[in-house]
Amino acid sequence: MVEPKYKRILIKLSGEALAGEKGVGIDIQTVQKMAEEIKEVHDLGVQIALVIGGGNLWRGEPAAEAGMDRVQADYTGMLGTVMNALVMADSLQQVGVDTRVQTAIAMQQVAEPYIRGRALRHLEKGRIVIFGAGIGSPYFSTDTTAALRSAEIEADAILMAKNGVDGVYNADPKKDKTAVKFDELTHRDVISKGLRIMDSTASTLSMDNDIDLVVFNMNEPGNIKRVVIGEQIGTTVSNNL
């Protein structure tokens, strides 16, 4: 068996990744394929946590700009992340991976409350843990959730699984054909250059807690496993190069 580079990871998925080609909603076949990819990594003995965005179902900022109360808009988005978490958990269970959903907002009928010690025990027992409802407070993104939960569970790396984007560039490669991809960056580089991998709160949390980020294209089958076993794909962000 290949020895994985990372023993404990947090995979950050965008909500749009669950929507497939439709771009909105949840495409069950797409989620099932992703579950198979995650299972491949789980079979290597890697401990896995997940944070999934909610942008396929709801976006708080545009709703607030249209006149909705921002706090209510953000809470609505948090519920969207729980919907995504439950669907992913079911798909993982169906491929034979024991999975738990923990939410930052209590909803005992559908998920466990987020309790760090319990999450760690689940990971140590080989269960996947999906963190839903953000951090339970408005104004904080699911990127910040990923960085915070990674620090709390002492993850070795955050895998930023991007939809059709194969790394970090100095400009938008879809708009600028001269854009150059970075293979490696420091967290300080990301912040000083204003590169939008995560929001600034999440980037600072990752830097302060010495957590590696790997940004890669999740649409390429097998890429999650390639990252975990240490193949050079995408862009790696760390404190030390």
Curated annotation (Swiss-Prot):
Pfam families: AA_kinase
Regulation: Allosterically activated by GTP. Inhibited by UTP.
Catalysed transformations (reactions): UMP + ATP = UDP + ADP
GO CC terms: cytoplasm
UniProt: UMP binding residues: 54, 74, 135-142
Enzyme Commission number(s) of this protein: 2.7.4.22
UniProt region (Involved in allosteric activation by GTP), positions on chain: 20-25
Biological-process GO terms, alphabetical: 'de novo' CTP biosynthetic process; UDP biosynthetic process
CDD domains (UniProt xref): AAK_UMPK-PyrH-Ec
Residues noted as binding ATP in the record, renumbered to the chain: 12-15, 55, 59, 163, 169, 172
Record GO terms (molecular function): ATP binding; UMP kinase activity
Localisation: Cytoplasm
Keywords: Allosteric enzyme, ATP-binding, Cytoplasm, Kinase, Nucleotide-binding, Pyrimidine biosynthesis, Transferase
Enzyme class: transferase
Pathway: Pyrimidine metabolism; CTP biosynthesis via de novo pathway; UDP from UMP (UMPK route): step 1/1
Gene3D superfamilies xrefs: Acetylglutamate kinase-like (3.40.1160.10)
NCBIfam families: pyrH_bact
Protein function: Catalyzes the reversible phosphorylation of UMP to UDP.
Subunit structure: Homohexamer.
Similarity comment: Belongs to the UMP kinase family.
Name of the molecule in the record: Uridylate kinase
Native species: Streptococcus sanguinis (strain SK36)
Gene designation: pyrH
